[in-house]
């Protein structure tokens, strides 16, 4: 792709973001497009593959502050003006190219702008293949409620793109090797001129910037040099993780290319519910059934903890149904080493059936209590 073609592509439009979009907005937009169009999810869908590649190209430029600045500068020269041209014919015009380019590039000057964009600031140079960061990988795991509170290590089988083992990343069939591109002599770059005035370098159209041409492609990766790789890995789930939370593990995604860093692993955690306890942030919740006499007269009851022990909880006389008591320090661990609390909510247990003696006792209690109704809407 020539520099002019590169500048004329609207990467902002491809990702669906504004020209002043923040890095996190660009990252979010690219992830959505990549997730919806990833070749692994749409095998054989050329349109989805094209959208994925186009979005990857746009993200590669816009997510890099230096490349984004150069791209915006190139757009101001080529994209918005329909191409950079000197006047031809008619009156001779004296143009100070250094001043013009310094103005167009916000003061960076001829050497900085064209040196960065075209790979040279005076004369031709050979460009090496730049490192590329590996793709991020998504994974899922399901753990118990107890493990979510205390933290655990899980074994996960992850599928990612890695150098093809069959061809060792060359893209060529086993027993063969790629040949050096005769067009660029292995540099991966091709010289072209802009109106006979400037000489620029751009990715070689024959080898697409690789410097090598695969004539007999690998049957596993079909010449790409990359293939699906499944590996088993130990993943640490931190204490206090919540149901549905995504955990980022740096450097555990797909391997990079040409010495680039590996991508990240994002693990979505599903937590199985507990029979007794619930969660409210860093607090644990538990329902404590009490009898009517206990709630009315007061009592001390034992309340379970997630550690398997119990604590004594004092129920004051006249405790209403639904009142919550706080047991400090018996909740979920925080990152600073402290813990949340245990929230114990009283639930008055009503017997489903009574024998005659018990019924008479309740009736006598009813008759001895004040006749005022507890329902405010019935008060006259």
UniProtKB/Swiss-Prot annotation:
Q: Where are the CXXCXGXG motif repeats?
A: 164-171, 181-188, 204-211, 218-225
Q: Which residues form a coiled coil?
A: none
Q: What is this protein called?
A: Chaperone protein DnaJ 2
A Pfam family this protein belongs to?
A: DnaJ_CXXCXGXG
The UniProt keywords, alphabetically, are: Chaperone, Cytoplasm, DNA replication, Metal-binding, Repeat, Stress response, Zinc, Zinc-finger
| Gene Ontology molecular function, alphabetical | ATP binding; heat shock protein binding; unfolded protein binding; zinc ion binding
- Give me the ranges of the annotated region Disordered: 32-63
- Signal peptide as annotated in the record: none
Record domain J: where: 10-75
The source's domain of life comes to Bacteria
Q: GO cellular-component terms in the record? A: cytoplasm
The record lists the organism as: Cutibacterium acnes (strain DSM 16379 / KPA171202) (Propionibacterium acnes)
Q: Where in the cell is it found?
A: Cytoplasm
What high-level taxonomic lineage is stated for the organism? Answer: Bacteria, Bacillati, Actinomycetota, Actinomycetes, Propionibacteriales
